[in-house]
């Protein structure tokens, strides 16, 4: 069975997320059809969604203007999986701590933007992630940090005692960029565990 994976293609590592979902699918003897989402009308036909990084205020403005935001919210309400990374996490949160970001309210967290510093302060760290047998090589680039977690949200990983990966129902959010490694396990955790269970 082919998994139809929509990647929000407004900003961020679109092709890298596509490659990661294809690697994760191959590990399950499946294929993935990657659909780049730039306009409304494509999300309803997707099995899973990826919301990449970029600039959260720009992403928020564009998805609301193009009518994509409502489709993402409906996707989540239908219980379909989403992986939201870095700015995607910020846009998905209930509170972005920035009035310029009109959030989707699909992950019950409050997120502080750029909490781990500027681009020059970017780093890689091995993370212990719930559901993974070995540590994950997480890449943090001007990463946000989660400073409030709702009671129904599962914390999957922390760094420096602060949540950096969470699951809220069908949505997995990460402060880091899992697509910038050759390791597809975060995509696997977000999609195939949910899709096949």
UniProtKB/Swiss-Prot annotation:
What do the Gene Ontology cellular component annotations say?
Answer: cytosol; glutaminase complex
The protein's superkingdom reads Archaea
Binding-site residues, L-glutamine: 54-56, 113, 141-142
Which CDD domains does this chain map to? Answer: GATase1_PB
Q: Which HAMAP family match?
A: PdxT
Among NCBIfam families, the record links this protein to: PLP_synth_Pdx2
| Role this protein plays | Catalyzes the hydrolysis of glutamine to glutamate and ammonia as part of the biosynthesis of pyridoxal 5'-phosphate. The resulting ammonia molecule is channeled to the active site of PdxS.
Q: What is this protein called?
A: Pyridoxal 5'-phosphate synthase subunit PdxT
Source organism per UniProt: Haloarcula marismortui (strain ATCC 43049 / DSM 3752 / JCM 8966 / VKM B-1809) (Halobacterium marismortui)
The taxonomy runs: Archaea, Methanobacteriati, Methanobacteriota, Stenosarchaea group, Halobacteria
**Encoding gene, per UniProt annotation:** pdxT
């Amino acid at each position: 069975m082919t998994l139809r994976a929509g990647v929000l293609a407004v900003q961020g590592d679109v092709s890298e997320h596509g490659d990661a979902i294809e690697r994760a699918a191959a590990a399950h003897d499946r294929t993935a059809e990657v659909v780049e989402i730039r306009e409304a009308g494509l999300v309803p036909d997707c099995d899973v969604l990826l919301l990449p990084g970029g600039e959260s205020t720009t992403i928020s403005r564009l998805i609301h203007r193009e009518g994509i935001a409502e489709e993402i919210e409906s996707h989540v309400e239908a219980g379909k999986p989403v992986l939201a990374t870095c700015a995607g996490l910020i846009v998905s949160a209930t509170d972005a701590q920035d009035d310029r970001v009109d959030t989707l309210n699909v992950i019950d967290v409050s997120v502080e933007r750029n909490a781990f510093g500027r681009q020059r302060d970017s780093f890689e760290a091995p993370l212990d992630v719930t559901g993974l047998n070995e540590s994950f090589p997480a890449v943090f680039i001007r990463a946000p940090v989660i400073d409030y977690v709702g009671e129904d949200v599962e914390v999957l990983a922390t760094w420096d005692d602060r949540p950096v990966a969470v699951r809220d129902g069908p949505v997995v959010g990460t402060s880091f960029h899992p697509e910038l490694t050759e390791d597809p396990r975060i995509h696997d955790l977000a999609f195939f565990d949910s899709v096949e269970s």
